Structures are given as structure tokens and as C-alpha cells.
Design a protein with these regions (language model features):
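A generic structural micro-feature
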Residues: 8, 83, 104-108
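A short coil-to-beta-strand element that immediately follows conserved catalytic motifs
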Residues: 78-89
Length: 176
């Protein structure tokens, strides 16, 4: 029997290691004021400034990230744009057990997460989730096998562990 798996419309995510010389921007990121939205026990804190990549201290890092985003847009997603710009950039600080709520970024095409700082035990990963309530999805939810680790096409979530210096680039519609 001759069979072929066709993985139609995959969702590409790329990871890039930031060059060590760009990590000097992390000193600035650590120095900016934090804000608490009232649920810091579960959510953590975030920067008061939601345009941190506009700071002169972040110029080289921001330029590197935008170059990576441009390469991803053109060569992975097939987008036809001459340049990209940040819509917003902020820092989110999490302790073990804290996490973002699941969300997308509807005001942009491409999103990125940059991990920096020290790795601690139980530092939360970023988890991407498959959206079931979308077009072309059966209203009948199937009974899934319990162990799907060897069946990537059946995964409903995928996590990337915290790794300082790692940049993760993905389509903004991807829930995370």
C-alpha cells in the first residue's frame, strides 16, 4: 500500500537564538518600571511602557528582531511587505506558577516572544493552543487517544520551554 500524509495549512513557528552581544538590552528591560493589574499572584507584572523596543537602549535588539520577522514573513509565510514595525512591545515578568491568559494578537500579522533573564526551576513555558471553535471545524468533538505525543497532527497544544536568549516568532492569530 502506498500512502502519503499531506499536512495542509501548517502553522509555522520559528525559534531564533539572539546573539549574545544583543543581550545588553536586557539590562534596560530589567530597569523599567513594572505595573500590577491587580492579579499579580496569578498573572505576574508587566512594564508600564508598552513600547519598550522604541527605547534607544533596545535599538540593536529591535532591529535584529524586525529582520527576523521580515525573513519569517517573506520566506515562511509568503507575505509581501518591504518592512515591518512594532505595533507594541512590552515586558512581562512571571514567577513559577504565573501565566498569561490564552490570547491572540488581532492587531498584527506576526508576533514574537523573547525570553531573557535567568532560568529558574518551574519557569513557565509558552504554550500555543489549537483553536477548535473556528471555521472548517466539526461541531462533533472526537474522542482522542490519550497519548498523542507521537501524533503531531493530533496535538491540541504545544509548549516551548523558557530558554534565555530565545526569540519565538509566530502568526498573530495563533492562540498562546
Amino acid at each position: 500500500m502506498n500512502k502519503q500524509l499531506l499536512t495542509l495549512f501548517p502553522t509555522p513557528i520559528i525559534t531564533v537564538e539572539i546573539p549574545k552581544e544583543l543581550s545588553v538590552a536586557c539590562n534596560y528591560l530589567d530597569s523599567i518600571p513594572q505595573k500590577d493589574n491587580g492579579s499579580s499572584a496569578t498573572y505576574g507584572t508587566y512594564s508600564e511602557n508598552t513600547y519598550v523596543m522604541n527605547a534607544p537602549e533596545c535599538k540593536e535588539l529591535g532591529d535584529f528582531i524586525l529582520k527576523c520577522v521580515g525573513d519569517y514573513g517573506r520566506n515562511i509565510l509568503g507575505y509581501d511587505y518591504d518592512e515591518y514595525a512594532f505595533s507594541q512591545t512590552w515586558v512581562s515578568w512571571k514567577q513559577p506558577g504565573q501565566m498569561h491568559h490564552n490570547h491572540t494578537h488581532p492587531n498584527s500579522l506576526i508576533s514574537a516572544v523573547f525570553f531573557y533573564g535567568e532560568r529558574e526551576e518551574n519557569t513557565p513555558a509558552i504554550t500555543f493552543t489549537k483553536q477548535f471553535a473556528v471555521a472548517n471545524c466539526s461541531y462533533i468533538q472526537p474522542l482522542m487517544v490519550k497519548d498523542r505525543k507521537d501524533i503531531p497532527t493530533a496535538w491540541s497544544s504545544f509548549s516551548i520551554n523558557y530558554n534565555p536568549g530565545l526569540l519565538i516568532i509566530f502568526p498573530s492569530y495563533l492562540s498562546h
